[in-house]
């Protein structure tokens, strides 16, 4: 049997960097209020002419460079996004075109919001383990600034745009050690964008609707449990985890998971202060940041975990 390992990572952030003080000039908020509740200081916002596929393609190019691969060697593309360029075709096929990949490899999107990268990575791992792919491009990319109500201070301060990518390649021994995905649609009202496109118009609100306390309570509980489950099912202990690479939504949620596992924040790759919540992009963005900064080194054990609307959540234990 062949296994899958990460052979390269890349990320991209739009040039426009927006501070908490910038937002305080537009809505009734402050740097102190945002930082105390979320840990967020900055977020990046895509330019008007930048689409999700543009962010994704640039992150992918950087991941390919890191892996030492030509785009033509990719035989699977999966893009995790809740903010696609258009209703169809998939953002993955648009990225395929922008990268000049003409080998006919499968390309499709996965939508699990902030857990999307976990779903995409797990799917790509299964493709490689089955022998259906050798080099998969797995991307998380979002332009959440376009589904945020910039007059709603409870949500507009939280989100940012960006993209992260990994190249997952066939290997003789496991890089992806174990993964677990979960979902529960009974909580869909806590976090959603209710608007629908039909008959030439948008029916319902096109903006994010969120019950912050409800999301926080569920996230803390389920992320702790799935972290425990993935580690135990793999035959590992929390002490063997070198780095947690979490979904970067809220510093307090991240701290809660680390505390539950008995790990200090020194073992957490933290980027929420610089990126805000970039949904499906946040984990691969943090992963690439940790690798390029020299924090994460080859041979180390990483726990990736995240949760998004639905709810959908997941965790992946891997050796980098």
From Swiss-Prot:
It catalyses: malonyl-[ACP] + acetyl-CoA + H(+) = 3-oxobutanoyl-[ACP] + CO2 + CoA. One of its GO terms (cellular component) is cytoplasm. Its main location: cytoplasm. It is found in: Cytoplasm. Pathway: Lipid metabolism; fatty acid biosynthesis. One of its GO terms (molecular function) is 3-oxoacyl-[acyl-carrier-protein] synthase activity. Keywords: Acyltransferase, Cytoplasm, Fatty acid biosynthesis, Fatty acid metabolism, Lipid biosynthesis, Lipid metabolism, Multifunctional enzyme, Transferase. Belongs to the thiolase-like superfamily. FabH family. HAMAP family: FabH. Catalyzes the condensation reaction of fatty acid synthesis by the addition to an acyl acceptor of two carbons from malonyl-ACP. Catalyzes the first condensation reaction which initiates fatty acid synthesis and may therefore play a role in governing the total rate of fatty acid production. Possesses both acetoacetyl-ACP synthase and acetyl transacylase activities. Its substrate specificity determines the biosynthesis of branched-chain and/or straight-chain of fatty acids. This is Beta-ketoacyl-[acyl-carrier-protein] synthase III. It comes from Neisseria meningitidis serogroup C / serotype 2a (strain ATCC 700532 / DSM 15464 / FAM18).
